[in-house]
């Protein structure tokens, strides 16, 4: 029974951190400010997380679990190449839009001046997503016998760059320019171009 409050406190700390990232765009979050927001001492924060880097790692774990598990569901449920790509991009954009503070972590903005391994971990996450997109595009050739005129790795990079750009605009606009704004029209254009290649 004593474990449950500890887990809830950890979750509460991470929720407060994400909220502060949202309400304080461009500002660095200190443990003193976070402790004040949570309503505990800095020492109490460190009882749950040995360092601020571990707090950010907690957010990154949430991001990884949320995105990668949903991408696996898309891969299992959907077989159409273009629909899979659309759903993966849409997932990234909706996730960022629903979690503005966490979008600063995805974008790297919140990690400036923090431990290098945090930025490396986000880079690894995006590399995994790009690999998934590449796999989706390559499977088109296997299933349909017809691929693309451009290498699938180049196309996967282009698709991911589109999503990353939309997330960057969201962060830069202080969460005013929604990542999903005009997505349907943009996707129709992108899909048309992909199918032409």
UniProtKB/Swiss-Prot annotation:
PROSITE patterns: HTH_TETR_2. GO terms for biological process: cell division; negative regulation of division septum assembly. GO terms for cellular component: bacterial nucleoid; cytoplasm. SUPFAM superfamilies: Homeodomain-like. Residues 30-49 bind DNA. It comes from the Bacteria. Keywords: Cell cycle, Cell division, Cytoplasm, DNA-binding. It is found in: Cytoplasm, Nucleoid. InterPro entries: Homeodomain-like_sf, HTH-type_Tx_Regulator, HTH_TetR, NO_SlmA, SlmA-like_C. GO terms for molecular function: sequence-specific DNA binding. Pfam families: SlmA-like_C, TetR_N. The keyword DNA-binding applies. Residues 7-67 form the HTH tetR-type domain. Belongs to the nucleoid occlusion factor SlmA family. Homodimer. Interacts with FtsZ. Required for nucleoid occlusion (NO) phenomenon, which prevents Z-ring formation and cell division over the nucleoid. Acts as a DNA-associated cell division inhibitor that binds simultaneously chromosomal DNA and FtsZ, and disrupts the assembly of FtsZ polymers. SlmA-DNA-binding sequences (SBS) are dispersed on non-Ter regions of the chromosome, preventing FtsZ polymerization at these regions. This is Nucleoid occlusion factor SlmA. The lineage of its organism: Bacteria, Pseudomonadati, Pseudomonadota, Gammaproteobacteria, Alteromonadales.
